[in-house]
Amino acid sequence: MACGATLKRPMEFEAALLSPGSPKRRRCAPLPGPTPGLRPPDAEPPPLQMQTPPASLQQPAPPGSERRLPTPEQIFQNIKQEYNRYQRWRHLEVVLSQSEACTSETQPSSSALTAPGSPGAFWMKKDQPTFTLRQVGIICERLLKDYEDKVREEYEQILSTKLAEQYESFVKFTHDQIMRRYGTRPTSYVS
């Protein structure tokens, strides 16, 4: 089987390589402005808003004409809208984190271990774990210790029962051996 690798040409060179009279069609250039795929992976996207694109982007270009690039004013407006959206998003993030901090400071520390269904747990977020990692470790240690104690008691009971059975069989075997060896002879102090 043959395997081949191909490289795509960058879009900026296509305009220079293809003349308007060329039989090949020109590839669409990407829209100017912010690209949605270039956000940092840990950042949450700002809330979606309905925006109307600029008038130059709404009208399709006739088939034979070149596509116009946005004017510096349109680029400035796009950047300004994106910056305002980013500021609102950051403001919401700060307000939410402050309200969470205030809520957790006003609650008593004893309610941190309440069950999720109890009335004292209404302030907890859904994503917040009920127990910390240390508390889970302590709970697991206690459960393992209790289970180990239970198994140990059960083992001791079974072992003592088996030992008692073995002792009884030993006594019976010894009694049978003595009776078989000496049979009907009377026992004496000197044997």
From Swiss-Prot:
InterPro entries reported in the protein's UniProt record: Akirin
Phosphoserine modifications at: S22
Residues bearing the modification Phosphothreonine: T71
Disordered: annotated span: 17-70
Family listed: Belongs to the akirin family.
Chain's role: Molecular adapter that acts as a bridge between proteins, and which is involved skeletal muscle development. Functions as a signal transducer for MSTN during skeletal muscle regeneration and myogenesis. May regulate chemotaxis of both macrophages and myoblasts by reorganising actin cytoskeleton, leading to more efficient lamellipodia formation via a PI3 kinase dependent pathway. In contrast to AKIRIN2, not involved in nuclear import of proteasomes.
Protein name: Akirin-1
Organism: Mus musculus (Mouse)
High-level lineage: Eukaryota, Metazoa, Chordata, Craniata, Vertebrata
Gene name for this UniProt entry: Akirin1
